[in-house]
Amino acid sequence: MARWNVCSYCGREFEPGTGKMFVRNDGRVLFFCSSKCEKYYFMGRNPRKLKWTKAFQEARLQRAKRK
């Protein structure tokens, strides 16, 4: 069984054969589940400020634990 990829921007898992793989000049590999994630990454948007990303949801849980 093939390994599922994890989006480098939003953290969502997606099936192999879908999405895009981007290889940076330093050799680091980035996977994107959608063109939306890819565009937001290259525009420099912070995933912790977008409610639909896993990074935002994890940060929100950490803030709730502190209170």
From Swiss-Prot:
GO molecular function: rRNA binding; structural constituent of ribosome; zinc ion binding
Cofactor: Zn(2+)
Record-annotated membrane-spanning stretches: none
CDD domains reported in the protein's UniProt record: Ribosomal_L24e_L24
UniProt cross-references to SUPFAM superfamilies, sorted A to Z: Glucocorticoid receptor-like (DNA-binding domain) (SSF57716)
Keywords: Metal-binding, Ribonucleoprotein, Ribosomal protein, RNA-binding, rRNA-binding, Zinc, Zinc-finger
Zinc finger (C4-type): 7-37
Signal sequence, start to end: none
PROSITE patterns (UniProt xref): RIBOSOMAL_L24E
GO biological processes: translation
Binding-site residues for Zn(2+), renumbered to this chain: C7, C10, C33, C37
Cofactor note: Binds 1 zinc ion per subunit.
Top-rank taxon: Archaea
Cellular component terms per the entry's GO annotation: ribonucleoprotein complex; ribosome
Pfam family for this entry, one: Ribosomal_L24e
Task performed by this protein: Binds to the 23S rRNA.
UniProt subunit comment: Part of the 50S ribosomal subunit. Forms a cluster with proteins L3 and L14.
Family affiliation: Belongs to the eukaryotic ribosomal protein eL24 family.
Protein name (database record): Large ribosomal subunit protein eL24
